[in-house]
Amino acid sequence: MENNSQNVLKKIEDLKKEVRMLKEENSKTKRNLMWKIRKLEKDKLLIENERTRLDREVKSLRGEIERFRTPPLVIATVTEVLDDHRVAVKSTTGPHFVINYSRFIDRKQLEPGARVALNQQTFSIVDVLPSEKDPVVTGMEVEEKPDVSYEQIGGLEEQVREVKETVELPLKKPELFEKIGIEPPKGVLLYGPPGTGKTLLAKAVAHETNATFIKIVASEFVRKYIGEGARLVRGVFELAKEKSPSIIFIDEIDAVAAKRLKSSTSGDREVQRTLMQLLAELDGFESRGNVGIVAATNRPDILDPALLRPGRFDRFIEVPLPNEDGRREILKIHTSGMALAEEVDIELLARITDGASGADLKAICTEAGMFAIRDERDEVTMADFMDAVDKIMGVEKEEEYKQETGVMFG
């Protein structure tokens, strides 16, 4: 009897162990199944997201195919606006039409001269197009600002101040002029010998202001066929008004603004037509708006008097050859990044380079560096600068230096 009880107890213990093992195995199996379920749910979510993305892409591609199947539109120009949602247009193919336009199109946009797109079958207006722009004109806009600041211009403190007052101040603080009750100046003419920093001043203006900067060399206005130059001038000012506040910089303006003479060739007459268009844009019937003008020339003596009257150019800023103090500042700017020997005397270089322009001084610094590179040296010596002065400005400057110091350079 006792043995039977022990056997029963043993079987019960065995069954308990088996139950525990089954529970553990069941728990482990459950965990595995839950992990697989979560993984499948995650995979399902990824597949659904991919399907959604592919559906959007298919929809986009179908829309692209539909756009390709759409027939091209006809470009026309509005000639007259009539009543009852009708306008008269002239198509690019030649004929004139009286057509309808949708009520969804803004009536104010349909002015004579506006460009519109017409349906090929019904010739109804389906869209109003932006005004046509000459690619030559749009290419004149400076997209990236020059890296020239006013601090990099030496010896022209007075000129910088006047340029700031004339060009920058009306754009940045127009309320000052309203408070005083005067119209801000909108035109400045920079004149002086070549290489004195006129274009550099214009670059600094472009760098310092947030206005649209349009740069053009005046010779680009000179065109082969009659009326092309005037059209280009008109396009430049239209672009400037559209993107105002803006600044137009006309370099070498004497190319189109020379004095008009009685006797002239057909080419001269076309240049004069271009000049008259420029005069009209500078101070014509329509206001220039928030558009500033900066022009530069080496020959102010040959400019047409009509260009020089107030209202077209309000300020005339002379950019002369730098004096000794100016040359010293310019040399300091150009040598600031150079490896100079201790013997280099900037004061002396400023004294012996009388008559040098800012461009000459920059060339002297560059040449001195080239002499050091040629001799495989790590620094620029005074002898290199003297050789550079000799090369850029002539032997007389080196002789002047020898007389001052009694030093000979081989």
UniProtKB/Swiss-Prot annotation:
Gene that this sequence comes from: pan
Q: Which UniProt keywords apply?
A: ATP-binding, Chaperone, Coiled coil, Cytoplasm, Nucleotide-binding, Proteasome
> What Pfam families does UniProt report for this protein, alphabetically?
AAA, AAA_lid_3, Prot_ATP_ID_OB_C
Lineage of the organism: Archaea, Methanobacteriati, Methanobacteriota, Methanomada group, Methanobacteria
Per the record, the coiled-coil ranges are 1-70
Q: What is a single molecular function from GO for this protein? A: ATP hydrolysis activity
So what does this one do? ATPase which is responsible for recognizing, binding, unfolding and translocation of substrate proteins into the archaeal 20S proteasome core particle. Is essential for opening the gate of the 20S proteasome via an interaction with its C-terminus, thereby allowing substrate entry and access to the site of proteolysis. Thus, the C-termini of the proteasomal ATPase function like a 'key in a lock' to induce gate opening and therefore regulate proteolysis.
Among its keywords, does the record have Disulfide bond? no
- Would you tell me the protein name for this molecule? Proteasome-activating nucleotidase
Show the CDD domains listed in the entry: RecA-like_PAN_like (cd19502)
Q: Which family does it belong to?
A: Belongs to the AAA ATPase family.
* Spans annotated as Docks into pockets in the proteasome alpha-ring to cause gate opening: 408-410
- Which is one Gene Ontology cellular component term of this protein? proteasome-activating nucleotidase complex
Native source species: Methanothermobacter thermautotrophicus (strain ATCC 29096 / DSM 1053 / JCM 10044 / NBRC 100330 / Delta H) (Methanobacterium thermoautotrophicum)
Where, per UniProt, does this protein localize?
Answer: Cytoplasm
Keyword Membrane, does the record have it? no
Q: Name one GO biological process term.
A: proteasomal protein catabolic process
Q: How does it assemble?
A: Homohexamer. The hexameric complex has a two-ring architecture resembling a top hat that caps the 20S proteasome core at one or both ends. Upon ATP-binding, the C-terminus of PAN interacts with the alpha-rings of the proteasome core by binding to the intersubunit pockets.
UniProt domain comment: Consists of three main regions, an N-terminal coiled-coil domain that may assist in substrate recognition, an interdomain involved in PAN hexamerization, and a C-terminal ATPase domain of the AAA type.
Residue positions binding ATP: 195-200, 334
